Each structure stands twice: as C-alpha cells, then as structure tokens.
Amino acid sequence: MEDGFSSYSSLYDTSSLLQFCNDDSASAASSMEVSDRIASLEQRVQMQEDDIQLLKSALADVVRRLNITEEQQAVLNRKGPTKARPLGQTLPLRTTVNNGTVLPKKPSASLPAPSGARKEVVVPVTKSINRTSSSERVSPGGRRESSGDSKGSRNRTGSTSSSSSGKKNSESKPKEPAFSPEEGYVKMFLRGRPVTMYMPKDQVDSYSLEAKAELPTKRLKLEWVYGYRGRDCRNNLYLLPTGETVYFIASVVVLYNVEEQLQRHYAGHNDDVKCLAVHPDRITIATGQVAGTSKDGKQLPPHVRIWDSVTLNTLHVIGIGFFDRAVTCIAFSKSNGGGHLCAVDDSNDHVLSVWDWQKEERLADVKCSNEAVFAADFHPTDTNIIVTCGKSHLYFWTLEGNSLNKKQGLFEKQEKPKFVLCVTFSENGDTITGDSSGNILVWGKGTNRISYAVQGAHEGGIFALCMLRDGTLVSGGGKDRRLISWNGNYQKLHKAEIPEQFGPIRTVAEGKGNVILIGTTRNFVLQGTLSGDFTPITQGHTDELWGLAIHASKPQFLTCGHDKHATLWDAVGHRPVWDKIIEDPAQSSGFHPSGSVVAVGTLTGRWFVFDTETKDLVTVHTDGNEQLSVMRYSPDGNFLAIGSHDNCIYIYGVTDNGRKYTRVGKCSGHSSFITHLDWSVNSQFLVSNSGDYEILYWVPSACKQVVSVETTRDIEWATYTCTLGFHVFGVWPEGSDGTDINAVCRAHERKLLCTGDDFGKVHLFSYPCSQFRAPSHIYSGHSSHVTNVDFLCEDSHLISTGGKDTSIMQWRVI
C-alpha cells in the first residue's frame, strides 16, 4: 500500500505547498497590487483543494484495491485453484455498478449489477428532441432525469450524424417462416424474397417451427478494447490519480492502467463518444456523445454523462433534448469546486451552454460561432470566464446571471490565423493559444489583447498545449510532429520529434513524474519524456475495419482495414505482434490451418500472403478488379477459396505449407456478390452466400455447383460463418432487410453462435440456432456496424471489429 501512496506523491509536491503557505512575505509585500494579492490567495486555496482531492483519490484507490483482493479471494473460495486469469483483472471493483445505467437517488433494496458486466439490453431514450418546456422522465432505475431546462428549450431539428445506422423495418407485416415436413426445409423471407434452407434428414421428423430456442448459458464480458479516437477528437487523454489513463473509442470510455496492464470500461453511452473532461477532484468525469438512431428508427439524442471513475456509477445525465447532432467540447469549472460545466454542441450555431451539473440545470446558453469550435474551457481562477476557440475565432465569454457576454480576441498587429486550434492557461491567469500559423499567443489576464507572442513556435499548426504542474508549457505540432517545452518566459527548453509512423500530435497530457502522454491523429497513444523516446501504449486502425482472422492454435488474431494496415495481435498481452503496411485497402483475411501464413484480400482484387512469423510477403496474386470479401482456406490446407464482388469464387490449390498457389478455376453461378464462405470438414465441399440471399453449394476441386439437395443437406461444415442456413436462420430479427447481420461465427465446441449487426450490437446465441426469433444475450460497445466476429482458437474469447468506429473489442466467454 505504501507503493500506492508513493505513486500519488509524484503527482503533487506538497512540500512546496507548505512552504508557500507559510511564506507571509507574499502578502506583506507593499508593492503587490490588490488584484495580485487576491490571485495569490486564490492560488493558495486551489493548491489546498488539490491536496484534499489527492487524498480522496488515494483513499478511493485503497478501497478499489481492497475490493480487488476480496473479489479474488471469493472466486478462489468458490471455484478452487484455476489457471484462468484472476477475476480481479477484469472485475477491478466489486462496488462498481452496471456501467452506465443511472442509479436511483433513493436507496434501493435491489443490488446493482457488477461493473465489469456489459450492459446487455440498451433501453433507448425516448424523450423528444423538440421540447418547449421543462420536462423530466423516470429512468428504468427509478431516478428522475431532468431535462436541465428551467427556462424553456430551444427547438431542435433532431438531426443525427451518428455512424450507427438505424434502419426502420417495413411497415407491412413481414411473412412468417414456413416449414415443409414433406421436403424437409424451412423457408424464411428477406425483403419479401424466399430463402429455402434444407435441414439434415435426421431432424425432419422431430423439428417444429413453434419450438422455443434457449438462451445460451455462457455470456460475454468485455475484457479489452484496442484503439483510440485521435483522428478527429481533441483533449481526450488524461491521467487519473489511480494511475489509469482515460480515453475513448466508439461508445466506450477506457480506463487503462498501463503498469498493471488492466482495463476498465465505462459503457453508459449508446453511440460515439466525442469529448471528455476531468473534474478538479480528479475522480468525476464527464463525457459527451453524438446523436444516434436505434434499431427501430428512434432517435438517441446527444447528451453529456457525468460519472464516477472509481465506481463507474453514472451520477448525472444532462442535455437530453437540448444538444443537437453531437456534444463536441466540454469542460468543468476550476475555481468554484467544479460546480459548473460548459459544453458546445455540433449544431449550425455551435451553441455554448453552461450547466449546474449537480442540479442538472442549464444556467445560460448562446450561439458561439457559425464555424467549427475546437475547444472550450473555464478560466482557472474566474468561474465566470470561459474561453472558446476554433475556425476564425477566439472568444472570451463572461457569465452574468443567465446570459453569456462575448469579447472577441483582438489580434491587432498580429496576423489573424485561419484556425485557433487550442487553449490553456498560465499560472498567473494568462490565456495561451496555439494556432494554425504555428504561433503561441499569450493574452493578458482579464483582457482580450495579446501581451506576448512566440512567432513560428512550430512549422505548421499547433494542435495541443499542456501546462505542466511545475509551470512548464508543452506544445505539440501537427505538421512538424514536434513536442516542445517552454519556461515561464516562453523560452524554449527541450524539443522532441515524434516518428512519422505515429502521425501528427493531436493532444498532450501530463503523466507521472516527467512522463508525457500524447494522442496522435493516427490513433496512437504514446508515452515518454522530452529527453527520451516515445513508445505506444495503445494503437488501432484509422479507417474502416472489416478483415478479421483467427490463428488456428495460438491466442492471436489478425485485423486489416481500409487504412492499408494488416496487424497481428497477441490476445494475451493485448498488443500487436507486428504491423504490415500493404499497397491497397484491405477487406478480408484468413489463416492457413498451419498458422504459418495468412492471406489478406483487398478492395482492388489483389491478395497477399504473409509469413506470420516474419511478416514477409510470400506471394501476391490478382483476381478481377473488385473487392475480395472472403479469404477461406480449406481445413486440410490444400485449397484457398476467395469470394469476390464480381460474383465469382476463385479457387487455388495450396502446397508447401501455404507458400505455393496454383489457380484451379472459378466458381460461377451467383447473381450477386459473394458475402460468406464455409468449407466442409472433409474439404470436399464449399457453401456460399451472396448479396441477393442465395445459398449455393460447390465441389471446389472441379469448380462445379452441386444442385442435389440429398447431397448437400447432411454435409458437416468445419466452420459456420454464412449468415444464411438452416443452423443459423434464427439469428435474423423479424422484418430484417437481409443486410442487418454482417457476420456470424460458430464456436469450435459448437454450442455458441455469435453475430455482429448494423446497430453496433454483438449477439450471443445458442447453437444450433434454427428456431425463428431465437433469444440472445446482447452486448453494446461498438458505435458503428459490427463488421466481423470470431472466437479465438480455444473459445475462451470472442473478437469483434467495428466498421467506421475502427475499434477492436475482446470479450471473455464466461
């Protein structure tokens, strides 16, 4: 425990505080102006508050660690010795509550769900976007959710810009599935089109369409999230006193303890998180999200959630029905105990609003700018001053009663930049900005005029500014990728350059001791010092992600995407084994059964084979000029089947353990693009699905279609990734348009079936899933289409990939 407290001492040096507080000369100096003396007292109070909050954080961490110990002991007592990873590593806190459901304010007799468990059913918010008066609703937890509008609400169009697609089901009643006991098939309908699926002979007599499928006894628990959203978000990286680095991707906020290699996850949001702020108490966190659309077409309004980073309890939800499109900037006030929160939305007017977040009341709002707003922050010593910056503007706002009054920053002799990209504050209350011209400008406290300028501090725009605890200013450049530190007189101290592979600096945060944390536009989180190297602690893809392949015998998987990267991941160490840049955007991948090579298909018709140990290129081929959606090796490793968007399946003979390829031919017969492929256990047959819901069977060695039902109905399939088939048709929801489900995978033990859909959900079914409307456990986390899912080699974990959210999520099967 002493080690735990020693880690906190590195965050704050209390000896300097005591020395400062005992020094009466500051207040006794006759030359000091009254305003400076007041500012000095404010600093003293703030430093004392920081120490108090530090002690609170330390105590909270002690409680967290004690609960981890209790949790581990309880598991050991219940299950006995086990080789499995300790429960405490994925359930760090026993008292944590259900990841985002708002808790009732009154005591409840029922116990909340554990924090680590994912929210399995999302209850969409149904409050209207357009409101004309104050309103409130009772949440499922029994807590009243105030609209936060005590003065009437702005009318909103409720436009949505979410990446999650919401498809309304057809108003006409869909046709029910039909069972033919004479022919032994089930017929279902997608968009009114019949899909006929023949069942094995031995199931015809016992099958009933009215039978009810059972929920699986196993469940999923989110264990790890790969990736970080730096490409289009700012100020979203912080170090908490508990030693956790907090950031977000998709709809999940990640709390990552790098030293202990543990992640916790706040999962209260139902769509993309776009902004994050940490309260002065260093425990309370606010996160804002975009608008979304639910599966049934209902709008999910943008809002801000305030939550406890120790327990993961949601404390307050504000702005439902007020914000438009997305919440892009948020910040807590500093000098009044963090009682206020400011937010900027993504409406055409980019409205700035100020909230008493504990009362969930809006104090004031005003049109901020017609142009993009990049940052909004409270002045550190004056609660009533807010600074916003963005395209062609820098504004100083004063909160007076229920109004916000604006003063524009005057550039005067200084050339006005096209973008003011970031803002921070000095110890004496000056405002400091970084702009697209590479200049650092200092604005005197209480004024809107420039008092000092550092011309050409960077080559190109300054994307981030961070004021360290010791008064050192750190600036991060975009174009030049440089990290530069400056003293109190704005003289350059140190300079470091981030390697080109990591991309431009997006945000800078202070870590432990002299460690600096950096988020980049290529979705890396780096840590290092100004005098040393920076190494990645988190990385992910930067463009749409579709390809996923699982190693046959190791806890490894490969992902590839439109960013032209193919990455092999270690699922145990949660880090990349290697990353390979390829020449074309990638779409699909597949491991050879030996695991020695992996094939990657692209959007251009080219496909590559790489050595999994060295990542060296083994061979490259081209088949057509359209997207290759599926790469699937036969179980015996002697064939490779490639499904293309030109409606054909290309078959290659494979020898030399996956290193030599000879084209056998192509299977033609589909009238639409190939979506999924599976091989039979004996490698003699192939089944395929297409974009127009066809199910066709093939003898791949001869590239001939098999039309005999008696031949195909009893084939045993080595894998089940086809979304259409008798054993999986129960995964389709009623009224589906046939494109809702992007991926299906069967566990190796053949008792579980998982799907990824267009609504950001991962579903876990029992296998076989051959009853209509089969029940499932539902898991949220992705904010875009779930493009692929697959179980690791021993079925211990499931991997899911997001499309536009570029995230990879690793779920533990429990």
Curated annotation (Swiss-Prot):
Homotrimer; self-association is mediated by the N-terminal coiled coil. Does not interact with EML3. Binds unpolymerized tubulins via its WD repeat region. Binds repolymerizing microtubules. Interacts with TASOR. Belongs to the WD repeat EMAP family. Signal peptide: none annotated. Residues 77-180 are annotated as: Disordered. GO terms for molecular function: microtubule binding; tubulin binding. Residues 31-72 form a coiled coil. Detected in adult brain cortex, hippocampus and thalamus. Expressed in the stomach, lungs and in Sertoli cells of the testis. It is found in: Cytoplasm; Cytoplasm, Perinuclear region; Cytoplasm, Cytoskeleton. Residues 103-115, 155-167 have a biased composition (Low complexity). Residues 175-814 are annotated as: Tandem atypical propeller in EMLs. Contains a tandem atypical propeller in EMLs (TAPE) domain. The N-terminal beta-propeller is formed by canonical WD repeats; in contrast, the second beta-propeller contains one blade that is formed by discontinuous parts of the polypeptide chain. InterPro entries: Beta-prop_EML-like_2nd (IPR055442), Beta-prop_EML_1st (IPR055439), HELP (IPR005108), Quinoprotein_ADH-like_sf (IPR011047), WD40/YVTN_repeat-like_dom_sf (IPR015943), WD40_rpt (IPR001680), WD_repeat_EMAP (IPR050630). GO terms for biological process: brain development; hematopoietic progenitor cell differentiation; microtubule cytoskeleton organization; mitotic spindle organization; neuroblast proliferation. Pfam families: Beta-prop_EML (PF23409), Beta-prop_EML_2 (PF23414), HELP (PF03451). GO terms for cellular component: cytosol; microtubule; perinuclear region of cytoplasm. This is Echinoderm microtubule-associated protein-like 1.
